[in-house]
Amino acid sequence: PNPEAAETLALAIKLADKKNADLILATDPDCDRLGIGVRQKGKIKLLTGNEVGILLTDYLLSEKKRLGKLPSKPFIIKTIVTTDLIYEIAKDYNAKVYDVLTGFKFIGEKLGVIEKQNELDNFILAFEESYGYMAGAYVRDKDGVVAAMLVAEMAQHYLCQQKTLIDRLEEIYECYGYNANLLKSIEFKGMQGIKEMNEKIEAIRNNSPAALGKYEIKQFKDYQKGIEGLPSSNVFADHASVPALANDSSLVSPRTR
């Protein structure tokens, strides 16, 4: 079961309604990714990976500061296709944000480099928009167990203030600016699908559009060229005048059936 898919949580939502539960926590079978649902105005609302990552970043930084446990040089790690709102939150805590390529192996690699610099104690959180989170360097991969514990703790923290996680998310948006996240998955089947996908990506790469709908493309980043100190990867990003849009072939996975 994929915790990103709403239909996966249908039974959990039904049980939550029966028990009037405030929170749903759901992992995939190997318990590395976490999906959550929050009761808001009587109904369960599912949160995206970006929304949960925003909440965790805000909660961990603010609580560590309140308790006097925020390290001197805190840092967050995220992937290049994950929300940039993290930068705005991090500024308030003098925290650094590292961007890496899509996939937790790159997050693990970055932690390894930082560990050699004796800076690992400054690590706060790593996450990607595809529902993977890691807090603490105990496991160098996305960890649904630790994420579930933190989300439950965070939810209880705000419920004690008569707030839901969605209420807190709205407060964050009011403070740092509203963000909308839309993920569109396109399935390409088999070897022919791989070929078709690569052809479409190359067509856009070789003839990048000047606009996306009514929005002018201000910047086109081609990560295949190994930009921003990152390894070469078949990813490009269109930075438009209003939205920021990312295209990642690893998020459009061919499935052989």
Language-model-detected regions and their locations in the chain:
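Short gly/pro/ser/thr-enriched loop/turn and capping motifs at secondary-structure boundaries
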Residues: 33, 53-55, 104-108
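Short Gly/Thr/Asp-enriched flexible loops that form oxyanion-binding sites at enzyme active sites
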Residues: 32-51, 86
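N-terminal small/polar loop signature for handling phosphorylated ligands or for N-terminal nucleophile
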Residues: 1-33
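Well-ordered alpha-helical segments embedded in enzymatic catalytic cores
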Residues: 7-11, 56, 106
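Catalytic or ion-translocation cores adjacent to nucleophile or general acid/base/metal-coordination motifs
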Residues: 48-61
